[in-house]
Amino acid sequence: MDAFINQKESRFYEVLMPFGALVAARLNTEHGAHYDIKKILDWTFEGCKASDGRTGWGVIAERWGEDDVHGLQGSITDGGGYAFLMNSFDMAWPLVPMVRYDGRYAQAVGKWMLNVTNAARLFYPYEIDDRHQWLPERKEITENVIAYEGLRKVDYTYKKASLEGMSPVALGDGPQWVSGQPETSMYSLYSSAQVGIFGAIVRKTNVEKILQLNCNATDFYSRDSFPTFLYYNPYDTIKSVCYTNSEKSKVDLFDVLSHEYLSREISVEGCFEIPAGSARLIVVLPSGSELKMKDGNYAVGTTVVTSIKN
């Protein structure tokens, strides 16, 4: 970690950089380290600018044509922009659980997840219109389960006549890498297989555009922990969101960002308010649990709920 954090500039490529943010946040919280998480996140989202690195690799923050593509990961510069589905899925793996260890970034991660889940649909042949994809005549073989590998701002590589002036364009690298590779190799098994990351993390709520994000789902090496969910409200008004209790016993909802209980003794469903443009980071506790201070953290018994710095 010391060698990583002491780099002079971003070396981001593919998926490893955001995992550094998760590791740093956990080391800071559980072992008293002081790694600069903001630096790692800036390196990730603003991208690599090193002339001897993967220059331009980062997170896209634009509209392409009529479509919002904010949050997709890939090259910010290649042909005006080239996003990849695998990389966009994979960033959620470390960043969503990261907020369990440092809630200061809960709002930013919640907003990013709303953007990227919205934009990811554009890789799927039945979710983007035929005029904006490279191989619509073969899309039936995908059954809308296999997506295109990439999404370009324009068809910079193949320059297909029918796609001239179109933005964005769903396509893939397959045919250009190996001579004789079929056009259908634009549909990507390796990318689409990782949709399970979103599948494990993301759930709808009773309010459109407010997602329930499971912060435990991809925190594979965590210690004992309570269910933790991130919610982000993109609206300019307060919204009431409801939590459904799947446990057999009653639960309480504790927001680690505001350090308050939002609802208690929920047997079936409990609702809470999220201020405009804000996030809630909810820990689901057995009803009546006693929160105590332990080594700078909130804990129930020997199980840490959250760091006080949240």
Predicted regions and their residues:
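C-terminal beta-strand-rich structural cap/linker in extracellular carbohydrate-active enzymes
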Residues: 265-309
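Carbohydrate-binding surface patches
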Residues: 166, 172-248
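Long, well-ordered core segments of solenoidal/helical folds
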Residues: 1-11, 35-72, 111-128
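Carbohydrate-binding/catalytic loop surfaces
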Residues: 17-35, 45, 58-83, 129-159
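Well-ordered alpha-helical segments within folded domains of soluble proteins
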Residues: 13-27, 79-98, 191-196, 225-231
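Membrane-proximal bilayer-interacting regions
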Residues: 70, 74-134
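Solvent-exposed beta-hairpin/edge-strand motifs
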Residues: 246-261
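C-terminal capping/lid segments that line or modulate ligand- or cofactor-binding pockets
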Residues: 88-99, 135-203
